[in-house]
Amino acid sequence: MALLHSTLIWIVYAIVVGILSIVASTFVYIYQTPRDRSAAVTTVCIFTLTALLATVLLLPVDVALVSSTTSEFGRRKDWATDHEVEKITYSLTVVYYFLYSLDAVLCLLIVPFTYFWYEEYDEVAYEDDGRFTRKPFWGAFKYTLVFILLTIILFLVGFFVPVAKDRKGAHFDLDYFKRLLTENHGERALTFALGLLIVMGIIVYVIYSSTGLAFFPISFIKSSPSISSPMLSANIESRLEENIERQRQLEGRCGGNPDHLSSKDRRELDSLVREERTLRRRKRLAEASRGQGRNFVIKVWYKLGAVFRPIKLLGGLLLLAISVMIWISMLLTCIDKAKNSVCKQKCGYILGKINIINPVNWVLVEAASVFPADYVIFIVLVLHLFTSSVVGIATIGIRFLWIRLLQIRKGHTSPQALLLATVMLTLITLALNYSISMIVVPQYATYGPQTFCDYPSIPASAPLDCSKHKEYLKPCSELANNPAAKAVCTPSVASTFLNRITLNFPFFGIVDFWAQFVFLGFSLIVLLISLFRTPRFDEQQMDEDAEEAEEEGLLAASGSRFNAAWQDTTGRTRDQRVRFRDDE
């Protein structure tokens, strides 16, 4: 029965990972530009995002497996011997170490290599005969050597860096904290490396995720005007008519010869010609966005989008409620940690016992008794925060200080920007792993629905049984003094690993904890600004999109004409020419 239950849990996780790959693929294909699409870049981005989300969404599996060892009456199940529990935690530890190591390698090595490879490949592309060259790979490897060296240094520092030496105090006498102190140098190296990556991710998380958490639901509620709206389309048509009429007036003055115009009128005429070109681009873009000239299915799709626009408003209100619930839960836990942490900054504000109940944590703990109900809620929570991070990156862009370097937009994101956004999402997801487990749902992430029986048994050696005294059932915690808690409660592997980081390297825990208050402040400011700010239509961006679409159309037409002319001249297609070279 226990084996069947564990197998079903892992099967659910495998299905979720498959769904995550679809989510990651959807994100990549929505944002990347079709003109510069690269199979290698697309594959790396999808695989990286899938691995990251799989790491975060392993937590409900962790909680379900360790919680399956206890009964609803606060006792260990008959099959849950110490050996069996150790087998469960060991298998989870192996999976976590594999996923965390994979995330680190992808972030520090694979994605940078792909970035440099695309830069080199973009310059070299193909030789004239259509075969690959080795130059892009060697050039990318040369630049990636710097990241390889940094990775080696990072793990060497983690291998030899001293852990927290201030181990005096009542909190270090607890068995739970003794187990967290790392003595293995290999574990210490991985712990240090991930702790540093989480701190780096916290910085990105505070800036982008806080913005997205507030702006994501508001973007549904207060959508910016669409170019396909009748008012804007009518405005474009009116301005185009005025422009043409003014050009006729100027041309009428000179009898069709612009040289007879004054310099002022010639400048005005040139300006009107440029404006007419821009307005015609906007008109074509507006017609395309309304589905004009497209097939019946596309037109129906646009009509349905207009009909179901009120549902989008309701969806925005629902997302806003989720964001507010997450914000309140984070605030309550942060206050609880700041006030009731057993060791404060000495152990990175580890919370030994939940003193203030937060709503998200309560819902997940209650739902955890009926797996996979908690998994569904947890997936919604993670995807909401992940999507908010994507929206934050798209809103702010990739910047250095106040200078925008690259822009993340639907259908207009270059491969370089997509790879950099993937690195940022990697760091953000590692930070999310800490924030969700330690701040949003601390009790659920540590012990889940596990309880122990605090009923005094007579004789003392008899097993505790609360089947008839449910009022004595208490949630498991690190500070429980009853020996029954130590015999029954099993913390999740994820919480053990994250608490090990903050306990062995308190500086990381201090930064991660206090950054949550900055996150809450930023998100509140962005929410207030978004509520009172009217969305504006970006005409400059629309002109750039229209110009880009026109260039793509011209390039496609030019390429077709060139290929046709070449085939007429040579008498054979390019494929035939390549086969002829191969035969030679």
From Swiss-Prot:
Family under the similarity heading: Belongs to the LIMR family. LMBRD1 subfamily.
Residue ranges of the TM segments: 8-28, 46-66, 93-113, 144-164, 189-209, 313-333, 350-370, 376-396, 421-441, 509-529
Biological process, per Gene Ontology: protein localization to vacuole
Membrane topology qualifier: Multi-pass membrane protein
UniProt entry tagged with the keyword Transmembrane helix: yes
Keyword Hydrolase: no
Protein's name in the database: Probable lysosomal cobalamin transporter
Main location: membrane
Classification via PANTHER family: LYSOSOMAL COBALAMIN TRANSPORT ESCORT PROTEIN LMBD1, LYSOSOMAL COBALAMIN TRANSPORTER-RELATED
Listed InterPro entries: LMBD1_LysCbl_Transport, LMBR1-like_membr_prot
Purpose: Probable lysosomal cobalamin transporter. Required to export cobalamin from lysosomes allowing its conversion to cofactors.
GO annotations of cellular component type: vacuolar membrane
Single GO MF descriptor: cobalamin binding
Subcellular location: Lysosome membrane
Record keywords: Cobalamin, Cobalt, Lysosome, Membrane, Transmembrane, Transmembrane helix, Transport
Pfam hit, one: LMBR1
Disulfide bridge map: none
